[in-house]
């Protein structure tokens, strides 16, 4: 039987050109409601810090530009972190994950509600060469550090880790 479901996500920026206003869509809240409606227990949320300067350079988001703070800071915003939302089904665990090899100092790092040390660039990047002009543009590789921690925390050696949205295969690569 399964144990936990870990969902990597972020809240979604709303663009004025597409929807007529600038804001955020509570995507993490939508995920939470969907899992609770399906009978899962919301167990935890990890916030993954991302550099707002890198986000501003990559997205040119108006709310992150310094000139916007100087012009009208009511339209400014903070950077958008990633989240890992953890859900589980209630019931007996026939094969508990004991983590006897996890030292206290590493557990304290993993137990932090904000993971500040995830290397945002540590991803599988080979997909870029395979892109075609007609390909979908939503490829978003997950950081390998995040996957490594979640596998360590929530699975035993030899367990099958189900990854329904395999994308470029980062979870399989880390497992």
Where are these regions (language model features)?
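Core catalytic lobe of class I
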Residues: 1-175
């Amino acid at each position: 039987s399964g144990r936990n479901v870990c969902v990597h996500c972020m809240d979604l920026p709303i663009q004025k050109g597409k929807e007529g206003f600038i804001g955020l869509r509570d995507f993490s809240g939508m995920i939470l409601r969907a899992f609770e409606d399906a009978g899962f227990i919301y167990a935890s949320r990890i916030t993954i810090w991302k550099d707002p300067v890198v986000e501003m350079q990559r997205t040119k988001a108006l709310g992150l530009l310094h000139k916007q703070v100087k012009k009208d800071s009511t339209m400014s915003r903070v950077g958008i972190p990633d989240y890992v939302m953890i859900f589980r089904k209630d019931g007996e665990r026939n094969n508990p994950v004991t983590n006897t090899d996890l030292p206290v100092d590493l557990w304290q790092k993993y137990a932090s509600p904000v993971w500040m040390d995830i290397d945002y660039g540590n991803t599988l990047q080979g997909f870029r060469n395979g892109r075609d002009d007609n390909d979908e543009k939503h490829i978003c590789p997950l950081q390998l550090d995040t996957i490594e921690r979640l596998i360590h925390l929530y699975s035993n050696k030899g367990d099958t880790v189900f990854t329904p949205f395999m994308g470029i295969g980062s979870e399989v690569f880390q497992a």
